[in-house]
Amino acid sequence: DVLVRINRPLRMAVADIESSIWPEVCGLVLPKVDSADQINFLCEIITELEEERGLDIGHTKLMVLIETPRGYSNVRSIASSSKRLSAIALGQEDFSAEMGMLEPEGMSLLSYYQTVQVAAREAGILPIGYPGSIAEFTDLDLFRSNAMVARRLGFDGGACIHPRQVPILNEAFTPTESEINRAEAMVKVYDEAMAAGDGAVAFEGKMIDVPVV
């Protein structure tokens, strides 16, 4: 799938959108989103272009980047602003600079990431990202560690700026064979318990019920 990252200044954003709404482009990445109104304005332009160019209305999906304190404060309304939205992420480099942080280190950004994650889950869209710097493409062990933290926290993917980062993200956010086998075994044990009339059952020494399965 092809997503085009447009520019933020409005005049440049509109020009980029004009150039990007085509059948081959399935979505846009919107940087420095500050409000739901900004999303709605750009969606009006996108809809006009889809109509003009014979595309289904809603063809073009959106991923938004939260990169400013104002955008962070409005993250819940932004996440639920349009049916076009499919994902939201914290833009760690720009956001950390706006906040006066020395570096976009994992722990310094963790609470902000989780706020964005909650907003995404509430809105039914994908939370994207990982604690740490997207610019880290030399220390791949650190990059892998950050990606694995995000996976454990419940994020659904991450962005990258260098080809060396791609296989690491694919590995981090793809269930392993052992995870798949464990999930299948859990479902089997639970289904057998339900068939026997039990509401909960032990699996690997812990109770499992509907929320867990």
Which stretches of residues belong to each language-model region?
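Expand to "…catalyze enediolate/carbanion chemistry for C-C bond making/breaking, isomerization
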Residues: 1-213
